[in-house]
């Protein structure tokens, strides 16, 4: 007959095994994500070094642009991995400030517009919006992730709608980012916020990503005591982020999350 202590040891061993497997899975996924752009960069760099004189100017420019794009992909992946590492170590310092949302949305839309020049961005705000209490850097990252996702998964010359509204009864501010992109199947809705989760379809395979953006977004929203949800049909998705309206006593508070 097993003692109570032996059950505790077995349970701890199982937890340790699960943690070890999670770490192995994480390393395997990161290695794959790093290997893909690095292989591309090395391949095109080798071609330029060994066959430069035989390539046309157009081919050289094309290969250099591929190297640049894959380098940017690597930088984005490393930045996301550093963010994930901070969040999981519970050493992420949050410095809260009371802010007006519209200027942050306007600035982020302008940044995204420079990347997706054919898209149209429609922005609407309620009048007399209350302020919200957030870490400004983290809030900007949330905005950029959501607007970039809406743009990335939509065809050229698509429209992205961004709205900020007040829910008077619940004293909250609701940020909505809506697109007319490829949509998300109902069976995938609960998966999209998971780490390294990407919907596998012929359309999504053509779009670069590492499956960390929405995981980071959801984690940051929840660390700042907000909520995030998504609705999607056959075409288009709408992400909503909800924050409580600011209170004066919260301004300037710091927290390590």
Report each predicted region and the residues it spans.
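Helix-loop junction within the histidine kinase core
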Residues: 85-96
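Primarily the dimerization/phosphotransfer
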Residues: 14-48
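Conserved catalytic submotifs in the C-terminal HATPase_c
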Residues: 97-99, 120-130, 167
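Short alpha-helical segment of the dimerization/phosphotransfer core of two-component systems
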Residues: 69-74
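A conserved beta-strand-to-alpha-helix junction within the catalytic ATP-binding
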Residues: 95-110
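Short conserved segment of the HATPase_c
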Residues: 184-198
